[in-house]
Amino acid sequence: MSTTTDFVGRNCPHCSAVDSLQTDDVMGEVACTACALVVAMGLEENVFTRYNENATYEDVDHHRERNANPTAATSAAGSLSAADPHMSSTSSKVVLHPTMLNCMRGLHKKAVLPEPVLDRGIELARAFVGGRRARGQRVERQPDVAAACLMIAAEEAQQPLPLAEVRCLDSSLGDVELRRADIVRELHLEDSERRLRDTFADNLLVKYILKLGLQVSLYLPHCKRLLTALGRVEALAGLTVADRVTTALLLARTAQTLSWEQGTHISKGKECDLGMEAIYANFSSKAHLEVTKVNKIMHLAVDVLPLIQAAFQDCGEPTAGKRKVDKNSEPEASGGTKRVKREET
């Protein structure tokens, strides 16, 4: 059952007002502050804040201990302080400029990221700003630094925040990639940065698949195979990793790429009845991307669709070493099991 936290950061479905939904955890209702309409009612109360008349002191203590334990994102933040034992005590005393804090909190709320991601981003920003101030250096373009810190924190929590999404959420940002390179060099995060880049595509694929409400076990291996095929097409060499992820997922939904595999048949879903422009717009709204950019990328991919299909077939089947039954073989008398042979590749 849905809770009030599921509506945080969403737009009003009636008047389309941006970030106008106000939640009431006690009444279990969500209302819009712009059109004054109740969006949802009868929602389940948060399990961590609901009143339990049968609760004991042991339950309360267990709840406090659980909140005190670090989560996956906050435990990853320990790698920074472990590299430099003096960094945690020094960075905790650094006071960030309100511009940087407001930018980071705004992006965090619009992107609907977990709270530990914001804490990790603030810790990275304090460590970076504290190091610059200790050497008497200025911190230029503080909003860009805040966005870069939040991007690193989101990738560490396996919820990547691509640059295109960041620019869509805040169009006033500048060269965020340059500030991110400065942060990585300043905090000695080169090894962590390489690991994040290796897992960026897979984590972003899972994030987009879940946003669209699709089956991960079906779309993830298929889209990864499409990513490999897109990398072999020279006409798409200028696309970034995030653009290729977007192209692979939308091709899997619109170009019937699942039927490209031999012996695979799929039924037409509701998205087949819609136009491609509507599918692109729906994905752009859920992924916080600009519709014009998504349309431009997909039009480029559709123009070279035969090349993508040829590269897709050359990539081979997703599951290597697939077995098939030999029709000419007879079942054994002992176990009644047919002899099988491995396909020659």
UniProtKB/Swiss-Prot annotation:
Zn(2+) binds at residues 12, 15, 32, 35. Keywords: DNA-binding, Metal-binding, Nucleus, Transcription, Transcription regulation, Zinc, Zinc-finger. Disruption phenotype: RNAi-mediated knockdown in the procyclic form is lethal. Reduces SLRNA gene transcription. Reduces, to a lesser extent, RNA polymerase II-mediated synthesis of alpha-tubulin and HSP70 mRNAs. It is found in: Nucleus. GO terms for biological process: transcription initiation at RNA polymerase II promoter; transcription preinitiation complex assembly. Its main location: nucleus. Changing residue 194 to A: Moderate loss of SLRNA gene transcription. CDD domains: CYCLIN_SF. The keyword Metal-binding applies. InterPro entries: TFIIB, TFIIB_C_1, TFIIB_C_2. Changing residue 296 to A: Moderate loss of SLRNA gene transcription. Residues 71-83 have a biased composition (Low complexity). A zinc finger (TFIIB-type) spans 8-40. The keyword Transport does not apply. Residues 59-89, 318-345 are annotated as: Disordered. Changing residue 268 to A: Moderate loss of SLRNA gene transcription. GO terms for molecular function: RNA polymerase II complex binding; RNA polymerase II general transcription initiation factor activity; RNA polymerase III general transcription initiation factor activity; RNA polymerase III type 3 promoter sequence-specific DNA binding; zinc ion binding. GO terms for cellular component: nucleus; transcription factor TFIIIB complex; transcription preinitiation complex. Specifically binds to the promoter of the spliced leader (SL) RNA gene and thus is essential for SLRNA transcription. Monomer. Interacts with RNA polymerase II subunits RPB1 and RPB2. Interacts with TBP; the interaction is direct. Belongs to the TFIIB family. This is Transcription initiation factor IIB. It comes from Trypanosoma brucei brucei.
